[in-house]
Design a protein with these regions (language model features):
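Carbohydrate-active catalytic/glycan-binding domains of CAZyme proteins
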Residues: 1-167
Length: 167
């Protein structure tokens, strides 16, 4: 449609977290704010799903648009034991060229799966750790501490040394 869309997280990662949108015909701006902002935010403080934000739009093979975002399910102490979960809600494009997520109702309580064929994972999920290097499936976040693990300490095993810390 000739627009650049800036999809931004606002409100931190706690309660009040949400997704706002701006758009511009020029990548460098200026950007106008969506009249539907926030396009995703939990407005009900008693709802079971909170902290909805950090979203991205994706389009599936059938042309349906979705918003993939993070959220949390707090327990009685307002802690999210499972941490930041991933969620998926449908996107609706409006007549004025903007979009809303889940018709502006906030996070769905039940996730709706896209109408796509099942994708079978073809890779072998077995690793005997008999190589001198870890397979790519053992990806590290950021730079790995190579002194905290070994494939040679006990051949055929992935040896990991933990460190002291509080959980």
């Amino acid at each position: 449609d000739g627009y650049y869309y800036a999809i931004v997280a606002e409100g931190g990662t706690g309660y009040g977290h949400g997704i706002n949108v701006g758009r511009s015909k020029n990548f460098y701006g200026p950007y106008e704010c969506s009249p539907y902002n926030p396009v995703m935010r939990q407005k009900d403080p008693a709802a079971p799903i909170q902290r909805a934000g950090h979203g991205k739009l994706v389009q599936d093979q059938n042309g349906q648009w979705w918003c993939y975002y993070l959220c949390g399910r707090p327990n009685e102490g307002n802690y999210t034991t499972v941490g930041r979960e991933s969620a998926l809600d449908p996107v609706q494009w409006t007549e004025d060229g903007w979009f809303t997520v889940n018709e502006g109702k906030g996070p769905s309580l039940t996730q709706i799966a896209p109408d796509l064929p099942e994708c079978i994972y073809e890779r072998n999920l077995f690793d005997d750790f008999n190589d001198t290097r870890l397979n790519l499936e053992w990806e590290f976040v950021r730079n790995p501490d190579n002194g905290s693990w070994s494939l040679t300490e006990r051949p055929g095993y992935y040896r990991i040394w933990t460190r002291d810390g509080q959980l």
